[in-house]
């Protein structure tokens, strides 16, 4: 819900950094994969209840996620890059939840419900993007993206705030 309203504030900084990294020969896919690897380090950190360290790795993942898009806009968006970005984001999001489940198995039903909701929203997100592609629907409200999608009640910003609160205030 908030993502499209804050893009004009954060994109200029990320785009400037992205252009610099691009000029150094760094590709968007390299940043995507590196960010994913950093984010996946949060899984064992969460499992061992090292929440601040997990938060740091998760934050790096999100920064790299913003940078890969900025680099892609500079170098040219590719289908492979869009695929990697979406798939690795979904894996990261579910890995964070799984890390919390490993830390507190007695809370697994809540984590299972959250992953269930990710599957539902992720499926509708991807199905709508196929529909939008076939019907030539586009917008730049969320920046230049490899796929088009509608805004939702909760998007990336709200998801990250929730994950931050979960790390800072574990039950």
Can you name each region flagged by the protein language model?
Residues 13-23, 47-48, 71-79, 138-145:
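Short juxtamembrane and helix-loop transition motifs at transmembrane-helix boundaries
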Residues 1-53, 158:
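Topogenic membrane-insertion module of multi-pass membrane proteins
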């Amino acid at each position: 819900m908030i993502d499209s309203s804050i893009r004009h504030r954060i994109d200029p900084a990320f785009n400037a950094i992205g252009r610099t990294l691009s000029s150094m020969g760094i590709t968007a896919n390299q940043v995507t994969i590196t960010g994913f690897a950093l984010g996946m380090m949060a899984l064992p950190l969460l499992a061992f209840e090292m929440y601040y360290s997990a938060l740091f790795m998760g934050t790096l993942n999100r920064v790299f996620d913003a940078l890969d898009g900025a680099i892609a806009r500079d170098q040219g968006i590719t289908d492979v890059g869009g695929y990697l970005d979406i798939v690795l984001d979904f894996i990261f999001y579910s890995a964070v939840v799984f890390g919390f489940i490993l830390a507190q198995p007695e809370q697994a039903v809540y984590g299972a419900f959250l992953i269930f909701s990710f599957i539902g929203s992720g499926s509708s997100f991807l199905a709508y993007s196929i529909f939008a592609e076939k019907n030539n629907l586009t917008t730049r409200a969320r920046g230049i993206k490899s796929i088009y999608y509608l805004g939702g009640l909760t998007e990336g910003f709200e998801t990250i705030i929730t994950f931050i609160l979960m790390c800072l205030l574990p039950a």
